[in-house]
Amino acid sequence: FGKNTTGGILNVIRTPVSLTEMGADLSLTAGEYGRQDVNAVVQIPIIQDTLGLKLFAAKVEHDGHVRNTTRNEDVGGDDKTNYGFTALWAPTDNFDLKVHYEVMEDTSVQGAYTNRNRVGELACTLTLIGFDPANGCEKDANDGKDKVESDSKNFSDNEYESTIITANYDTDAFLYTYIYSQRDMDEQNMQDFDGAPVHLLRMNFFNDWEQ
């Protein structure tokens, strides 16, 4: 924060769990290129003033506004699903325990890469020495702001699972807080880096993380 700062913080405050009132919140969004967003939150007080449950889910879909002329399909779209729950237990005025669990599934297209292969680079050299197709070079490319021509689909298959447990104990003089978290990440991403209809440089990489 302030002058010459190279970093900062983003504080995301979620909707709190209600211990007193049942309720629901639903929002729908639709737009061009197959845009469809659905967000839902449901509040369920299980024991009045003591135990409550919040359920949530969201879905984002978008076909993408860039046309791949080689594959004859729209690319650059989104396909994300998020769901989970938060439970809050407050047996006394000075103690509460919250358990949060959620899953994020992301099968979005990993971008729409344009052909930037200059003369002297391998994808362009293949074209110059007679290999097909004839537009491996940027100078021969037909792509633009809403059109690409890579031969591969930049797909993803990612799943993120998170658990957070928070306990607060207030002694009037001090507030003691314990936070436990666990996150599992399973990722697969395919990216066609050459951006041309030349079957040359693509990466299909996998990550499996736990923290």
Go through the PLM ranges and name each one.
Residues N72, D78-Q211:
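Outer-membrane beta-barrel domain signature, strongest for Gram-negative TonB-dependent receptors
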Residues G2-T69, E73-Y83, N94-F95, E161, ...:
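Outer-membrane beta-barrel translocator/receptor signature
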